[in-house]
Amino acid sequence: MSSKSRRAGTATPQPGNTSTPRPPSAGPQPPPPSTHSQTASSPLSPTRHSRVAEKVELQNLNDRLATYIDRVRNLETENSRLTIEVQTTRDTVTRETTNIKNIFEAELLETRRLLDDTARDRARAEIDIKRLWEENEELKNKLDKKTKECTTAEGNVRMYESRANELNNKYNQANADRKKLNEDLNEALKELERLRKQFEETRKNLEQETLSRVDLENTIQSLREELSFKDQIHSQEINESRRIKQTEYSEIDGRLSSEYDAKLKQSLQELRAQYEEQMQINRDEIQSLYEDKIQRLQEAAARTSNSTHKSIEELRSTRVRIDALNANINELEQANADLNARIRDLERQLDNDRERHGQEIDLLEKELIRLREEMTQQLKEYQDLMDIKVSLDLEIAAYDKLLVGEEARLNITPATNTATVQSFSQSLRNSTRATPSRRTPSAAVKRKRAVVDESEDHSVADYYVSASAKGNVEIKEIDPEGKFVRLFNKGSEEVAIGGWQLQRLINEKGPSTTYKFHRSVRIEPNGVITVWSADTKASHEPPSSLVMKSQKWVSADNTRTILLNSEGEAVANLDRIKRIVSQHTSSSRLSRRRSVTAVDGNEQLYHQQGDPQQSNEKCAIM
């Protein structure tokens, strides 16, 4: 019995009893009398003494039992109170956790929606950029075509101008010939007028000579009539004289009559012969004078007629030449007018084309500026969204780490694949290393743990291109396979790049290719120069197309292209860096996460998709 009491007195308290034991509820007990005093003062037997000792021990045991029972009752009361408090706290924590979870899920849904909208906007922007790039290339091709047509039109204009100048020279020559012919015509007209006057004078002289001839003929006729009349008178006088003489002679001696008749006949014959001779002489003189005058008049008339015919022929030929020259001049003037009209039309068309091309270029530049502004704005918005998303992903990662820590502390082992958990943890660690995180305090709240059921990994290769230039010459485009490098002069002045070098490096210290431009190479405003590798089938057409003799551009995933001036200073560069974007998708009963990691040392992104599923599993935080 004594050993039992001793074992009961040394019993340990129940687990969880951390408070100090209170004194028993009974009143203070008197100290037990010592054995020596009892032995000395009471003459009791050893049996009674043992009974008293047992009684005292039982009293002590009863007191300790009462104290223990009271303590147990107090602990039960405290336990019930603490149970109520724990239940109240648990309900409060559950309610707060549910509210925070709902708010967080709403924010996640909103963020997911914003990310989806951003992805759609980015895809739409990329499609629009590609479409606008194609439209820009098409407009550039049209602009090149129009420029070629404009160059052809300018060549035609120059050709037409040269032809117009030739026609103007011919026209001036024709005008000079026309003036000369007009002068010749005026001289011919003057000569014709003089000949006309001479002809008039000749005709007047002819008329006068004709009148003189008529007068002479009339005079001759009058003389003939007068001669005839005189002959008649003479005959009558002779007859009268003969009659008188016969009358007289009839009265004279018949002897002298025959002699006198013979003498008279002889005298009459002589007189008649003399008159006839004189008349013949006069007739011959008049006839000779008349014939000479007529011959002179005929010769003068013939000369006048010949000169008149010659003048008329010359006038006719001159008129024919003048008409032909006038017709030629009219044709040349018409052709010149047509050419001038054509030149004006071509100049107007050229001006319209230049104005239209200028307007198209202005519109394209405005559109490019607007697209650049939109791209800048979208990139800024995308960067803001990415910052927000990264912050949310970091919050999610911190929350997940807290859950993992609580599960590890409480020895809760989720049923998951080890490789998937390691990959997911590695992604979380990479995200924590790569991105500056905002520390989330570890609050002692209840959280739901994610039980991963399945996961999936994807990797996509992408290239990042960045370019910069100090001057007007920039590296516009490079071929990933190393076929060509294209330079572009974005300024409005011609740039001489003779002696400049174009280098292409692999990983800064790897193999490289260097091409040095000829000293006479120049880039026109808005001009493009393409440097081709030697193994391509491009044609060497300087200065726009240059083919290297024996070199070819190096190609790799990470390349850097540099343009050096004659002093060795870098004036333009273009970097092309390969990025591997890995996607990790894991689904669980509570959540579905997707992590996207860009393995180029720049960024690591995490996305969470899907609605969290409800679970009855809880984590008790003491």
Swiss-Prot record:
The record's account of how the chain is modified after translation: Three forms of lamin have been identified in D.melanogaster, lamin Dm0 is rapidly processed to lamin Dm1 in the cytoplasm, Dm1 is then assembled in the nuclear envelope and is then phosphorylated, forming lamin Dm2.
Positions carrying Phosphothreonine: T10, T12, T20, T39, T47, T413, T435, T597
Modified residues (N-acetylserine): S2
Linker 2: region residues: 242-265
Keywords: Acetylation, Coiled coil, Cytoplasm, Cytoskeleton, Intermediate filament, Lipoprotein, Membrane, Methylation, Nucleus, Phosphoprotein, Prenylation
Phenotype caused by lack of the gene: RNAi-mediated knockdown in spermatocytes results in spindle envelope disintegration, failure to form contractile rings and central spindle microtubules during meiosis I resulting in abnormal cytokinesis and multinuclear cell formation.
Residues covered by region (Coil 2): 266-408
Propeptide boundaries: 620-622
Sites of S-farnesyl cysteine lipidation: C619
SUPFAM superfamilies found in the cross-reference section: Intermediate filament protein, coiled coil region, Lamin A/C globular tail domain
Motif Nuclear localization signal: where in chain: 446-451
GO cellular component: cytoplasm; lamin filament; nuclear envelope; nuclear envelope lumen; nuclear inner membrane; nuclear lamina; nucleus; spindle pole
Site (Heptad change of phase): L289, D353
Residues bearing the modification Cysteine methyl ester: C619
Sites bearing Phosphoserine, chain numbering: S25, S34, S41, S42, S45, S235, S250, S311, S442, S455, S459, S595, S615
Phosphoprotein among keywords: yes
Region (Head): 2-56
Compositionally biased region (Polar residues): 429-440, 605-622
Renumbered residue ranges of the record's region Coil 1B: 104-241
Coiled coil: none
Record-linked SMART domains: Filament (SM01391)
Modified residues (Phosphotyrosine): Y249
Family to which this protein belongs: Belongs to the intermediate filament family.
Protein name from the UniProt record: Lamin Dm0
Organism expressing this protein natively: Drosophila melanogaster (Fruit fly)
